[in-house]
Amino acid sequence: MLIIGSIIGIIADRNREYLINGQFLRDHLHLRKAIADKDKVIKSNDIMIFFAFGQSNSANYGEGGYHCRNEVYNYYKGDIYKAEEPLLGPDGKGTSVWSRLGDMLIDSGLYKKVIIIPIGIGSTSIQSWVEESSAKKLDQTLNYLGKDNIKPTHIFWQQGETDNVDGTSKNQYKERLKMLINVFRKRNIQAPFYTSITSYFPYNNNNPLGINKGITEAQQEVAKEVPGVIEGPNTDSLNLAYYRYEAVHFTEKGLDRLAYEWFKKIKAAEAN
């Protein structure tokens, strides 16, 4: 027993940050059962397969709970599960905007089924996704998708708060966002890439209302200049107290509104 206890202690120490944020437990002890007919779901007609990533507000840091009412699925490391909160993939242990969005897309009749591929990580900068630790997670996930011959139909990027605090310049952000888009294009994933307009963070910066215009202009300009990139919702506009707890992450009401703003952007783009 002493030996077993020592081994557990070593593992826990080496993975203490992983354990704290709940990611380790969900990776190894989530106890969820993968669906048996994975290929049948993937090959369904009228299905959206969306890749969703960024920092905490894309990564299960929302308040409250949510239960999907439609055929909304969660792809994770080669398996597909019925979507449950917290989604498998992101590092947060709360609730996501993406499950709500999946239901809205199906309720609207735009799609009959939705598969979510979520990999968001709290507090990450855009540089982390193109050159540092988060890039490894992105690459690993794309490798899993490649093995399963799955290509996302849509890509949703929601990030910018950390770059607001870090003081990332407009030109730096633009260049890194283009690099991030090219990660998908180099793998022949030509799905539309939606970038939210996101920078709002009320602490640790001197920007008016906590909004960094350099970051938001970079996101808007990439959407205008780069083929296949679409401007997503302006999350900075959802900064009222009843939309955010601790002034940063989304409440249940905030998640409902955020999902609706994503839905409107997708519906408008697909009507063209």
Go through each PLM region and give its residues:
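Cell-envelope and extracellular/periplasmic
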Residues: 5-272
